[in-house]
Amino acid sequence: MKRVLLTVAMLSVFFSAMFAFFPDVPKDHWAYEYVWKLWQRGIFIGYPDGEFKGDRYITRYEAATAVSRLLDFIEQKMLAGASGDLAQVVGNLSDKYMALEEKVNGLTGILDTLASQIGTTQANLTETERELLEKIDAVKEEIEMEFDKEISLNREVVNNIGLKLGNLSRDYERYKENVDAKISEVNEKLAALEKDLGNKIADLEGIVNLHEKDIINIYNKISSVNEELNNKIAATEEKLSRKDEEISAMVELHEKDIINLYNKVAALNEDLNKKILDTKAELSAKIESQEKTLNMVYTKLLDTESKLNDEISALKEKDAEIQKTVDLHEQDIVNLYGKTSSLEEDLNMKYNETNEKIDQVKAELEDKIESVKAYNRNLSILTGAFFGILGLILIAISGK
C-alpha cells in the first residue's frame, strides 16, 4: 500500500512539473535538471509571465529572494527546524552589515562636510590676506606722501619709519608662508584620511561579498548533499523492493544496533543544536559590541565637527578684529602682528589636536575591521563543523 501511494505521489509531482515548468527552458539544455530541481523546491519560481529567462542577468534583489527561499527550504526539509536559528543569524548579520555600510557612508559625508568647511575657511583667510595687503599698501602710500612733504625737515624719522615698514612686510610674508604651509598639511591629512576611509569601505564591501560567496557555497554543498541523499534513497528503495522479506527478518536481529544508531543520531543532533545556540549567542554579543563601538566613533566625529565649527567662528571673529585694527597707525599694525602670532600658535594647537583625533578615529576603525575579520574566521569554522557533522550522519546512515 505504501509503495502504491509513493508511486502515485511521484507521478502527480512529475506530471504537475511537466505542465507547469518554465516553457523557455528546453529539455536538451545542459542546465535543465538543475533549473528543474530548483523550481521543484520553490527556490526559483520564474517571472510573472511564467518564463525563466536564463540569459538575463540576476539582480541583487532576485539573488536575495532566491537565498531567502533556499533558507526556508533548509529550515523545512533538511534541518527540521534547527537551521531556523542559523537562517535568522545570517539574516541579522546581513542587516548589521547594511547598517554598518550606512554608517560608513554617513562618516564619509561628515568628512566631506569638514573638507568643505576647511576649504571655505581657507578662502576666507585668502580674502582677509588680500584686504590686509590692500590696507597696508594704502597706509604705505599715505605715509610715503607725508614723507615726501616732510622729508626735508625730518629725514631721520622717515628712515626709521621706512625700516619699520620693511620689517613689518617681512614679518607678514613669513606669517603668510607659515599659514599656507599649515593649510597644505591639513589638506594632505584630509586627503590621506579620505583615501584610508575609502580602503576601509572597500574592505567592508569585500567582507559582504565574501559572505555572499559563503552562502552560495553553502547552497552548492547542500544541493550536492541533497542530490547524493536522493540517489542513496533511490538505491535503498530499490534494494528494499527486492529484499523486503530479508530486511524484515534482519530487523529483529539488528534491533539493538538500530536503537543504538538512533540514540547516536539523537545525541549528534542535540550537540549540533547546542553548538548552534552557543554560536548564535556569541555572534549576537560580538555584533552588539561592534555596533556600540561604531556609535562611539560616530559621536566622536560629531564632537570633532562641532569643535571645528567653534574654532572657525573664533577665527572669523579674530579676522574681524584684525580688519578694524589695520586702519590704525604704525603702533596698531605692530599690535596686529602680535595678535597674528598668537593666532598662529592657536592654529598650531588646534592642528595638533585635529591630528590626534584623526589618528584615534583611524585606530578605532582598524580595530573594528580586525574584529569583523575574526568574526568571519569563526563563521567559516562553524560552517565547516556543521558540514562535517552532516557528513558523519550520512556516513552512519549509508554504512547501515
Curated annotation (Swiss-Prot):
Record keywords, A-Z: Cell outer membrane, Coiled coil, Membrane, Repeat, Signal, Transmembrane, Transmembrane helix
* sequence repeat start-end pairs: 208-232, 251-275, 326-350
- Membrane-spanning residues where? 380-400
- In this chain, the stretch annotated as 3 X 25 AA approximate repeat covers 208-350
Gene3D superfamilies for the chain:
1.10.287.1490
**Signal peptide extent:** 1-20
Record bears the keyword Repeat: yes
List localization entries: Cell outer membrane
Record Pfam families: SLH
One Gene Ontology cellular component: cell outer membrane
Q: Which residues form the SLH domain?
A: 21-81
Give coiled-coil spans as residue ranges.
Answer: 85-379
What is annotated about its quaternary structure and interactions? Homotetramer.
Q: What does this protein do?
A: Links the outer membrane to the inner membrane. Long fibrous protein that could serve to separate the two membranes.
Protein name (record)? Outer membrane protein alpha
Organism from which the protein derives: Thermotoga maritima (strain ATCC 43589 / DSM 3109 / JCM 10099 / NBRC 100826 / MSB8)
